[in-house]
Amino acid sequence: MRIGIAGMQTTELAAKSIQETLSDAGFDSFYFRNNSKTTMADLVIVLGGDRGVRNYFHRALDVDTPVLGISESESNGVLAQIELKELPSYLNRIKKQDYVIEDVPRIGVKVDGKNTYPVLNDVSVFTSKSATLMEYILRVNDEEVWHDSSDGVIISTPTGSSAYSLSAGGPIIFQASNVFGIISVNSLDITRRPIIVSDNSIIEIDEISSRLHCDVVLDGIDRFKINNKLEATKFTPSARIIRMKADSTAVSALANKVKLAEELLSMPPSSKLLLKILEYEGSMTQKELASKTLLPGRTVRLAMKHLMDKGYIKRNVSMQDARQKIYEIAKLD
């Protein structure tokens, strides 16, 4: 079996370490940056946790090769189930191909008529400044569903339903469900509820307007200015993800949310924000967190200490740079 090694910001040193582990177990492996080389592999190991896997599939030219997502350390990953330190214990199963390959749905996105890359979690529309209302019309298969005024709107896959969508009041959707969720964020209409549609639907967010310009946000990573219309449809082919563990990502995500709920109510706003960013984005450095949230460095440090004291996050040494510390969500027992 030939294994490719890729990952967001993966260093050649880290890749070499994994290659040595694979070589000792009898695997032929190679490290690559150009996704066109995935055709040379029977399986691709992607580092960087869920965020690394999402980033990989945003750029992948060939998605037929199944992907095994790996986190650098402890993580409640949905796309990346296993930790780097666990990899040696799974190599025998990998050699025997004793795993399940799951077809994970993706959403194809058009912004004002132009295609973007497909998303694994969600696509959303918000104004360029938070807490600013936008108006839009939601259409499903050319039928108008609602005319809304809200902070934004999210279209989610089953995978993304346990991420930002859930925090905005959306439902948890089990992985095998052939549906997408649509969630209005803080609508002025208090009766507005999330809806579930077939993943074969054509979803349109149309006639978008606000006193500020609006942005499309893809998987919580990239933002693009939008003038009038977003179209979302099922994208083929799906992403092929290797599952080494049989636990239900939907059930485990819900259990974690319930366990956190009580203490979240009394948590400082800065801690809530940082926890949410780590939950959605995956492992990040303190500098990355400050840049992402625009919080002062001192506020970030105090909030991270609070979260570590509570056991919500862990601090680890980056495998890419031993001088650098990374933070990520800790597993809940």
Provide a role label for each language-model segment.
Residues 1-47, 52-62, 81-102, 110-117, ...:
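ATP/NTP phosphate-donor binding region
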Residues 278-281:
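Short helix-capping/hinge SLiMs at alpha-helix to coil transitions
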